[in-house]
Amino acid sequence: MSNPTYQYYNQLFKHLQLPLAYCDINLLEKNCQDIALRAAGNKTIRIASKSVRCTAILKRILDSNPIYKGIMCFTGREALYLIEQGFDDLLLGYPIVNKDEIYDICTATKLGKKIILMVDCEAHLKLVNDIAAQVGVIQPLCIDMDMSTDFPGIHFGVLRSPITTVTAGKKLIDCFEQYSNISLTALMGYEAQVAGLGEKNPANGIKNFVIPFLKKKSITDYTKRRQELVDYVKSKNYPLEIVNAGGTGSIESSKQENWVTEITVGSGFYSPALFDYYSDFKHQPAAGFAVQIVRQPKPGVYTCLGGGYIASGTVGIDKQPKPYLPEGIQLTANEGTGEVQTPFEYSGSEKINLGDTILFRHSKAGELCERFNELHLISDGKIIEKVPTYRGDGKCFL
């Protein structure tokens, strides 16, 4: 499909209060369809809420195709908030140790909600078990297996779970026998070095040449580890309901693992700028933000109000918002995207003036919603609705 033009968006936005964030529903629906096709088979897709951060969009994705089932949350309070909003089947992607949060989640479990807590050490098990005993419930848990691979001189992956070996995983699995108020119902392994690392990112320079090789070797490594731990859990007769894997960038490899039951996807729905740099897939730029030209300091240079919405992670040029439309925008080396104003050099063919809009895409997906109270939903050339983000609902979970 052909993406909308600059004038398509400019006419929609130029008379509104700017900056604003938007989601193009036509492109979002296309992404939902394409992601479902990539994952088609015998697995479901769990939505990573941190990459969406808007309940209206979460509902749209869940309703778009039966393959979308359940949400991976990023904090306990977010999970409880989503329960209040009518969502269920929630998997926390990260451990929590706040006793009040755990107590409230155990209480929700007792009331019939499906919330699975993440653990990666015996201290987590004991903490949740003690609180679940107070509540009078058996709380389901998920073990986070580290999927990183160590090569000579290179740690290829992230620093998350201490369950880095099959032996460590078996040891933690055996610990469940000591506790009566927790149950092992899920395993998760997020292969960040495959799912979240593009092969064509200009900021990575010469590293791009070796990344595909490292990915291939890493997939072989962690696939074997994941299978061994799944087999071990089954040998212990635990009621394993979920084996969660993947991310937007590793759907194809994760779906090849027969023991995996579901794949988590998040960033692919909005398809932010960092997801332009993958070799094997391309999704549509469904979300972004619009700023307004308010100055022209000299010929060929314009300045917008706002724009400095920088992504998390290691500091780098690829964490800046990426100019989207019109084509021909070059950020200045001295200022980049600014706290209050963003200057840029322009060499494009579109005629632009004071009051016109300039479109950017955030480097990451859900973080866009931390800077705006609402998303303007666009469909077929019209703004059809304005929906609150988490921030617009008065929520700030991290």
Question: What are these language model-derived features?
Answer:
Residues 3-8, 27-57:
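N-terminal glycine-rich anion-binding loops that anchor highly charged ligand groups
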Residues 4-23:
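Generic N-terminal amphipathic, Lys/Arg-enriched alpha-helix
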Residues 28, 50, 82, 143, ...:
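Conserved, mostly hydrophobic/aromatic
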Residues 48-191, 196:
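Active-site-proximal beta-alpha core segment in soluble small-molecule metabolic enzymes
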Residues 54-56, 82, 194-197, 250-253, ...:
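Flexible loop/turn segments at secondary-structure boundaries
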Residues 147-271:
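Active-site loop/helix belt of alpha/beta enzymes
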Residues 203-217, 223, 249-326:
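Active-site loop ensemble at the mouth of alpha/beta enzyme cores that anchors a bound cofactor
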Residues 296-398:
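C-terminal accessory subdomain/extension
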